[in-house]
Swiss-Prot record:
Subunit structure: Probably interacts with chaperone PapD. Assembly of the P pilus requires periplasmic chaperone PapD, in absence of the chaperone overexpression of this subunit is toxic, with PapE accumulating in the periplasm. Misfolded protein interacts with CpxP, which probably targets it for degradation.
GO biological process: cell adhesion involved in single-species biofilm formation
Listed SUPFAM superfamilies: Bacterial adhesins
Record protein name field: Fimbrial protein PapE
Pfam families: Fimbrial
Organism name: Escherichia coli
Keywords: Cell adhesion, Fimbrium, Secreted, Signal
Length: 173
């Protein structure tokens, strides 16, 4: 009887300990999503002021260098910028209501910066790395260039104010 009693205690103790493992269920879940946030881009205006129509060229002149300020909370790796516009022609922004012909008008060509000078043409809708980025930590400034040109017949251009918009999105990868 003593043998059975001595054997029962370890068997019962083992059953109790094992039953705790059997009843254990994963009841805590930890989840989320890691993201790299886009930069917050400040509004930028490039003002050509008065441009005489006869001084325009179809391929673009009246070059302006401009800067875009932004705050990038995540700034590790390589900055990628994408510029898009609603009205485009041949990789330029087509400025609406600047010609007597609706499909023609003033064009804005965009270029990357190359060590402060005009660089390669920017392909709208395609990410690129800015050639000139300045700033520390999260506060960044990129330099770009723009030129004015036109599509169609110069005689069809309409004198008056002009305005076009584009969207610039920047993030690091």
């Amino acid at each position: 009887m003593k043998k059975i009693r001595g054997l029962c205690l370890p068997v019962m103790l083992g059953a109790v300990l094992m039953s705790q493992h059997v009843h254990a269920v994963d009841n805590l879940t930890f989840r989320g999503k890691l993201i790299i946030p886009a930069c917050t881009v400040s509004n930028t205006t490039v003002d050509w002021q008065d441009v005489e129509i006869q001084t325009l060229s179809q391929n673009g002149n009246h070059e302006k260098e401009f800067t875009v300020n932004m705050r990038c909370p995540y700034n590790l790796g390589t900055m990628k910028v994408t510029i898009t516009a609603t009205n485009t022609y041949n990789n330029a922004i087509l400025v609406q209501n600047t010609s007597n012909t609706s499909s023609d008008g003033l064009l804005v060509y965009l270029y990357n910066s190359n060590a402060g000078n005009i660089g390669t043409a920017i392909t709208l809708g395609t990410p690129f790395t800015p050639g000139k980025i300045t700033g520390n930590n999260a506060d960044k400034t990129i330099s770009l260039h723009a030129k004015l040109g036109y599509k169609g017949n110069m005689q069809n251009l309409i004198a008056g104010p002009f305005s076009a918009t584009a969207t610039l999105v920047a993030s690091y990868s």
